[in-house]
């Protein structure tokens, strides 16, 4: 039973490629619960997946076209356009990463499995430290958990 639980945890498809970085304690309560699929979970999961697809495909992918055009031929653009492209790239990066996280969390949510959130409005942070605590939260927790190991 223990081997099966560990194998399921390590091979859990929504987090294996994209994240979020999960600890055993984060998911064991819902990952191993034999619960039937509920309409509420399916609705919430689908909503989160669609929101993630919107962020990734509509916002991030469209910004990528503009940013790539400026970055490839930056010498022919003014400083203001390059600054706008840099800001757009920051938004693109966030929308792509958080959109993928929304899809992962939504996919797990379809089955009633709760995964930790990975973003908490990082661009509203007032300090660099606060930004780091809000951006890729699970990576920060992973580093914090291992600081005594290193």
PLM region spans:
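Membrane-embedded transmembrane alpha-helical bundles that form the catalytic cores
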Residues: 1-150
